[in-house]
């Protein structure tokens, strides 16, 4: 049997260096190969449902960062679906800066480690209670 938690870690590692421009939700082109790899891992996982959790650094307001992290995680899901991942296998959620560790005053390069997407394997019993994404319908984020 395939260890889905281990696969979640592999997917997360593949997505570790997916880069976004500051304050934007669009994935930068140099990150496309990482998305290709993550998509391959998910497609070979023989089922398995994965929650992609977006995180931001501490710069900006809590509310703004929460919205941005939601948009970024949803964008990664969209990019993976474009690469053939079954939409029923992936969902997204944003955490904003809740788990950011680097100070707001640190350099952009230092804060980069807080801007990431985490991947969690979710059991079927829990999966149905999680929405596809947590983006409020009225909110518009710059692309």
What do these predicted regions represent?
Residues 1-49, 108-109, 122-143:
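Periplasmic peptidoglycan-binding/tethering modules of Gram-negative envelope proteins
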Residues 12-23, 35-73, 79, 87-104:
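Short, surface-exposed beta-strand segments enriched in small/polar/acidic residues
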